[in-house]
Amino acid sequence: MKKYFLKRTSLLLTILGCLSFACTNHNSETGKGKWISLFDGKTLKGWHGFNKTDTIPNWTIEEGAMVCLGAAADAHGGDVVTDEAFENFELKWDWKISPGGNSGVMYHVVETPKYPAPYETGPEYQLIDDIGWPEKLEEWQKTGADYAMHLPNEKKKLKPVGEWNSSKIIFNKGHVEQWLNGERIVEFQAWDADWMKKKADGKWKDYPDYGLAKKGLISLQDHGKKAYFKNIMIKVL
């Protein structure tokens, strides 16, 4: 009996060891806790047009940057999204826009024909020419804002149009941080009473599914002007 017990124990430990190894490999492959590149600097692999399965006509590669050509006639049709969905993450990227430019980075985007554009579900880190935009901008429309929800603070330091900026979004179990050029400029808790009130009282009151998804795609916005992105990295939390 003792010998049989030892054999069973040894077999169980071996199985557990294999499972542990498999789980470790799975985490390594999915990049949990490690930085994963979402853009290889050469191709659009890993991205596709929102609600599209064909090629991406509005985007190209220039000098290692993913470039939006600004070919969309309006805010619909030219946005791209990742092939993979993310829940809790730290996302960082470098970006610049053209004079009078407007773009954004969205997360937790739900992709179905029900939604004409990513912004109907995905919160947006706003990117825009704060100075050269042809119309007066409200603070919630300016670069670094959690668009139409939370304003950037006094630590915001935006580089001139045409120069590279660095941005970051951290989403971890509803706690959200937005960073610009090394400074945390926005911080809030998704889905709390304050968040719900902002949604109900503002631009998103007519978009019932805005910001509710807990997992979704990352999206880069085409809003009619050239925008440049590189060093797009994500770490699953």
List each language-model region with its residue ranges.
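Carbohydrate-interacting regions of secretory-pathway proteins
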Residues: 23-237
